[in-house]
Amino acid sequence: MKMDENELSNYKKAASITTSVLKELKIAPGMSVLELAEKIEKSIESKGGLPAFPANISCNEYAAHDTAAVGDTRKIGEKDVVKIDIGAHVDGYISDRAITFDLSGENGKLLEASEKALNNAVSIVKAGVNVEKIGEEIEKTIRSYGFRPVENLTGHSLGKYLLHSGVEIPNFSARGKGAILEEGDVIAIEPFATKGIGIVVETQRTEIFSAVFELPTRNVAARNMFKEIKEKYHELPFAERWVANSFERKVALRDLIKNGSIHSYPVLKEKSNGLVSQFEHTVIVEKDSATLLI
């Protein structure tokens, strides 16, 4: 189903923001991860949008869901492979983008593999295509470079205030009941290429969360925090550093996580510690092609 002009306008505004932020982005060894994340998020706001999720800064074997912690002292390393995954929304309509920087200058082919896979995948998107075909194209491209796709990370459909709205876009030749794309669908395609075995696992570190639904708690501060989070972020992911700036609020957040009101997104790491690259675009599915939102 075709979207209305207001929806399309907001998607385009969000896309212009993420494109502008990424074009202006400079990554160098020694940069503070915390300062970089805050700079990206403030830049999104200064351009008229809001962050759709915390700026993800995932280095080397860390593939996804990594953002700065409160008081984070980490620095970008001299030879890091740095994945920057950002999202902006305008009235809930989201643009989701990612690029990778190779500070060593030694991993160009790894970056090329995921970027080429993205371009090839976008080229076959149209109404009526099974998402399995997209996964096949991504895997074929990445393997042609001698690398593996990360099989348990996927692209996804987008909805208003929904970063993941139900449809998964595989990054490998999945066999099963893949969804059929329809005209007007908005999807984020994000191939991950790796020198490792192609599987990510959860780590013990978590900085990103999202509201699910409110469950009973005796903690008044926790109840108030949940209402605040829902009003401000809806179901979109948020960072602990955005909401828990005091001991009381940290305790409140932990109570909400413990009782299931808040969902956690642990940092994901390639299982064999292989380097990972990522590129991502948001596209609108059209009758005979796809519109790249840039």
Regions found by a protein language model. Give the residues of each.
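Active-site neighborhoods and metal-handling regions in enzymes and metal-associated proteins
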Residues: M1-I294
